[in-house]
From Swiss-Prot:
Region Disordered, residue ranges: 442-492
Protein name: MO25-like protein 3
Pfam families for the chain: Mo25
GO biological process, one term: intracellular signal transduction
Gene expressing this chain: mop-25.3
GO molecular function term, any single one: protein serine/threonine kinase activator activity
Gene3D superfamilies found in the cross-reference section: Leucine-rich Repeat Variant
Family assignment from sequence similarity: Belongs to the Mo25 family.
Organism field: Caenorhabditis briggsae
Alphabetical list of InterPro entries matching this protein: ARM-like, ARM-type_fold, Mo25
Length: 492
């Protein structure tokens, strides 16, 4: 970092003066917070807003542009005074929207300019790469110190409809850190002393806002609330899996209530969110348990008859996932089998017009129709028993022993180190020999494919024919009756 500052040193007194003013504003802002904390007084938001304006102008103003040298120093000055960042987040709810926007900008500025990824600008100076910037460890430590304030921000929500986007930007920065995200998902409404402060955790408070549709009616507000869900559950799949494994029953029930809501916008967003979870390859176990609930597919059938086209399309997307699943639960498989003809007729009637040129939607309907046409009404094998699992495991182990090479260690004496402790042999002391299996133990009745002769090849299989191991079966009539299962262990 010192080398970087030497290369970006600029001897412009005007720019240096502005940078020093910004650093002084940071220190002055810290003193204001400390004095008020000692007096147990409320923060004077007007004085704090003035200091924030000075710092924001020194960073983002075009007329008072600060050199990269001073921007690095200013960002590190914030990290050297973590109490300033903590107090800024503490007053985030009480200040005006314009000041909230500046606090958001400063937090993004600190994260970006203290990162480890840099690019060269037109003047040759190194500037951080905002697209691939990785937050530094010191910035993550500052965020973790502010975790209880962030929980309050997520739990209480936004002060006005025009500031919900600013709240989501703050939550996104907080959720990028794995430790902070896990702390948010584990929240149960307690403070740092494990004292119960809220009735529920911050995640369930987001559900409460969606249930209170009489208070939050604007489409932009509902869209931002669902974006909060996406920010929390799309950052780290391991943290999301932990939350789902411990709260899947309540979480799925809450989303079923949202799917059954009277607001078509909430229905559309809820179905899309569930579809995104099912499409995530890391959520295979969550998808299996959630899809086993018959109430979900009943809601899908219900919303296929909706008068709103967006709701119908999202329901078809979920139906496509159900018909593709080869291991549906018996109640789910039975429901689809009973209504297969009706579903086929519905998909054929509501398929998009080829003139619409919507390729993704056309492929969705075609794929759903194909799976419904080839639907097998017999119940699939569901949840294999423990005995079947052990039997298949022994069969795979036997096949692996018969068709793999055995590694034999050459008999080389081992000399102890200092005549006291035996040492492990070096890699060169192992000699790998090929031990061919006996003809009696090989499976002579099964042959996968025929020997192909390659003309002009010195390594042709025809030049080194395989020794006969039994009668050659006719093509496409291979019998698997010769395969014998190992005897069952009576001890199990």
């Amino acid at each position: 970092m010192l080398c970087l500052r030497r290369r970006t040193q600029i001897a412009n007194p005007m720019i240096n003066a502005v940078g020093e003013t910004a650093e002084q504003a940071v220190k002055k802002l810290e003193k204001v917070f400390e004095v008020l904390k000692d007096r147990n007084e409320r923060f004077p938001l007007t004085e704090i807003s003035k200091q924030i304006d000075v710092i924001w102008e020194s960073v983002f103003s075009v007329t008072h542009a600060t050199a990269p040298q001073k921007k690095y120093e200013l960002a590190e000055e914030f990290l050297n005074h973590p109490g300033v960042v903590k107090n800024l987040l503490m007053v985030f709810d009480g200040v005006q929207v314009e000041t909230k926007r500046k606090i958001r900008d400063l937090l993004i500025f600190i994260r970006t300019w203290t990162s480890n990824d840099f690019l060269a600008d037109a003047e040759g100076s190194l500037v951080p790469n905002p697209r691939q910037a990785r937050p530094s460890q010191k910035f993550q430590d500052v965020l973790y110190e502010c975790r209880f304030i962030m929980l309050h921000i997520v739990h209480e929500g936004y002060a006005g409809s025009d500031s919900i986007g600013l709240y989501n930007d703050i939550i996104r920065i907080f959720a990028e850190d794995d430790a902070c995200l896990m702390f948010m998902l584990k929240d149960k409404g307690t403070d740092s002393n494990e004292v119960k402060q809220k009735f529920e955790g911050c995640v369930w408070a987001i559900f409460d806002r969606l249930f209170n549709t009489h208070t939050y009616r604007g489409f932009h507000i509902l869209a931002e609330i669902f974006e909060t869900f996406e920010i929390i559950f799309s950052q780290n799949h391991e943290a999301s899996q932990y939350f789902f494994y411990n709260n899947l029953s309540r979480f799925s029930q809450s989303f079923h209530w949202l799917i059954a809501a009277n607001n078509f916008f909430i229905q559309t967003k809820s179905l899309r969110f569930v579809r995104d979870i099912f499409s995530n390859r890391y959520m295979a176990e969550v998808r299996r348990q959630w899809m086993a609930d018959p109430s979900l597919i009943k809601y899908v059938f219900l919303h296929l008859q909706s008068i709103h086209k967006t709701v119908c399309l999202e329901a078809v997307g979920l139906l496509n996932i159900f018909v593709q699943n080869p291991c549906n639960a018996p109640p789910i498989h039975k429901l689809i089998s009973i209504n297969r003809k009706l579903l086929l007729e519905y998909c054929r009637q509501n398929a998009p017009n080829p003139k619409d040129e919507n390729q993704a939607l056309d492929e969705l309907f075609d794929e759903t129709i194909t799976y419904l046409v080839n639907w097998n009404e017999e119940e699939p094998a569901h949840e294999p028993t423990a005995q079947d699992t052990l039997k298949m495991r022994s069969i795979k182990l036997k096949m692996r022993r018969e068709h793999t090479l055995e590694l034999v260690q050459n008999e080389i004496p081992l000399f102890p180190r200092n005549n006291l402790l035996p040492t492990s042999p070096r890699q060169s002391s192992f000699v790998y020999n090929r031990r061919l299996p006996r003809v009696s133990s090989s499976r002579a009745g099964i042959r996968f494919g025929e020997t192909r002769n390659v003309k002009g090849s010195p390594r042709s299989r025809s030049q080194s024919p395989r020794p006969p191991t039994g009668p050659e079966p006719s093509p496409r009539t291979t019998s698997y009756q010769n395969v014998r299962f190992p005897p069952e262990d009576s001890s199990r």
